[in-house]
Amino acid sequence: MPWSSLFQPVERLNAEAGLEDWYARLLARLGGTPQPFELALLGGLQAATPGLAFLAGYQAALRVLWPAAPWTAGALCVTENRSTRPADMNTRIEGQQISGRKDFVTAAECADWLLVAAREEGEGQMPRLALGVVRQGAPGVRIEPLPALPLIPDIGHARLHLQQAQGERLAGDGWDAYVKPFRTLEDTHVLTAVSAWLFGIGRESGWPDALLLRLQALLAGCAEVARQAPNAPATHLLLAGLFSEQQALAGELDAALAAGPACWAELWQRDKGLLRIAEAARAKRLEKARHIVAGF
């Protein structure tokens, strides 16, 4: 990881030409095929908004999940009727065809490929997931944009409609190998990207050295957690520590931003809640991890 890049002058990328264009320009700046953590770190650093930093972290997590993914933007499609439980899903994969609906797909507008969680068990069997890949624009694939949310409104969401769409089934169990670990991969890489965005703003705005040093330490911790197995109990414990460190900086961050350009403070006040979206789920994983490592 070229850490020296963190301390170089930053030219931020905006998304005036759309998210797909933004992501392509980011990859070009990073040499075309960056490692996932580098994509999250330097993508966050160069992002013009917290939402774009989120997008860099999200794409980085997807690349860890599916290392053979094309070098275009993608999305993971799981949620149906506000649930991610396999038993609540109706989307199915039969052979190489996928049919169903996903209700909340992040960054669908710029996604070239879509990873779709779909049930594949036989009649009378327990729900079992597979993960299939479909391409946006292919026959049977339709994206329905949803209204922008108050949080990171520059990153869109959509419903995905599939009608006998041609798909490639990825190897492994859809839940254990993909959906379950992605939660931790996303948390780690989004925290990295957003912290890098803050660090870049702080260097530009002349924040106190002590605050910048703590952000550096947080990023170094993210690098270590990114190397760990996402389903390991110790990983959940370490990741919880990183989020605790980030939350402990909240007052200092708000004060530093308030003392600088109003544009950065306004963006952060609007979007800082993105780091708390999955807070309840992380707390459950932390409690479970504590019991496992304690031998309960």
Task: List where the protein language model places each region.
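Glycine-rich flavin
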Residues: 2-110
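Residue-level signal for inorganic ion chemistry
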Residues: 62, 132, 198
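Active-site glycine-rich loop that binds ribose-phosphate moieties when present
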Residues: 99-100, 138-149
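DPxDG-like acidic metal-binding loop motif
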Residues: 99-137
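Glycine-rich beta->alpha junctions and the first turn(s) of the following alpha-helix
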Residues: 147-225
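Secondary-structure edge/capping motif, primarily at the C-terminal ends of alpha-helices
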Residues: 205, 209, 222-233, 253-260
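Short amphipathic alpha-helical coiled-coil/interface segments
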Residues: 219, 239-250
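Glycine-rich phosphate/cofactor-binding loops in nucleotide/flavin-utilizing enzymes
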Residues: 258-296
